[in-house]
Amino acid sequence: MTAAASDPHNPRSSADDTASPRCESGQGSFFGRRKGHKLRPHQNGLIEHLLPRLSLDPGASGPSDPATLFGRPVKEMRIEIGFGGGEHLVAEALAFPRTGFIGCEPYVNGMAKILSQIEAHDIGNIRLLAGDASELLAWLPRASLARIDLIHPDPWPKRRHWKRRFVQDATVAEMARVLRPGGEFRFVSDIADYCAWTLSHLARSPGFLWLAERATDWHNPWPDYTMTRYGRKAEREGRRAAYLRFRRESDAAQA
């Protein structure tokens, strides 16, 4: 835990935060569905016509069988919170066509980018939520997910904004509820303080076990990891990311 916190990571500037879309909802509040660059006409068309067909509504009754969300059989289901430009989520969906994916992203530009990729590759195993990730977790049934990914989230570096970080005791408890035993929460960040924060919150949850035995386990991406645009930028600027994996322990193992 302390090793992750001691790496010399450089905090992102506020300009980088704006350029790097993220979905944050620490205590059930939704911090900003925003729009950056002006959308092209085709992107506007995708937002208007394709997004409604793929969007989920946590205000509706929760699905007893989440596989029904995809209109075809899926072996398991994963979610990615704050997918940004969608590079990682699209790569995962193409690599695992029998897995259902839900992506949460509040930024309209991020939605437009991933919709373009979904259309171009005819991807049928992605569903989307342009809203609060904590509402999505609360909406899903117990033990319904195989994995949750949180990749380069907004670190909210100012102390008064820490409550806006996605990783909070309440969201960790919700992740433990919706992940099946053996499922994983995966976290990537180049911000040392947020890595230490995440390790601290997960360490005090009996539902999770940090899957690291040596420093190389969290210094390097897991096999087949797709680097995001922000991740490549961080590497170019000399900022090392931590790649943290936490396994959902069974209730029997916790006893």
From Swiss-Prot:
UniProt-recorded name of the protein: tRNA (guanine-N(7)-)-methyltransferase
Pfam families the UniProt entry points to: Methyltransf_4 (PF02390)
Binding site for S-adenosyl-L-methionine: 80, 105, 132, 154
Involved pathway(s): tRNA modification; N(7)-methylguanine-tRNA biosynthesis
Function according to Swiss-Prot or TrEMBL: Catalyzes the formation of N(7)-methylguanine at position 46 (m7G46) in tRNA.
Highest rank taxon of the organism: Bacteria
Enzyme Commission code: 2.1.1.33
Family: Belongs to the class I-like SAM-binding methyltransferase superfamily. TrmB family.
Keyword Methyltransferase appears in the UniProt entry: yes
Stretches for region Disordered: 1-37
Residue sites binding substrate per the record: 158, 190
InterPro entries noted in UniProt: SAM-dependent_MTases_sf (IPR029063), tRNA_(Gua-N-7)_MeTrfase_Trmb (IPR003358), tRNA_methyltr_TrmB_bact (IPR055361)
Upper lineage: Bacteria, Pseudomonadati, Pseudomonadota, Alphaproteobacteria, Hyphomicrobiales
Enzymatic class: transferase
SUPFAM superfamilies linked: S-adenosyl-L-methionine-dependent methyltransferases
Entry annotation: catalytic residues: 154
Catalytic activity: guanosine(46) in tRNA + S-adenosyl-L-methionine = N(7)-methylguanosine(46) in tRNA + S-adenosyl-L-homocysteine
GO molecular function terms listed in the Swiss-Prot or TrEMBL record: tRNA (guanine(46)-N7)-methyltransferase activity
Alphabetically ordered keywords of this record: Methyltransferase, S-adenosyl-L-methionine, Transferase, tRNA processing
One cellular component term from this protein's GO annotations in UniProt: tRNA methyltransferase complex
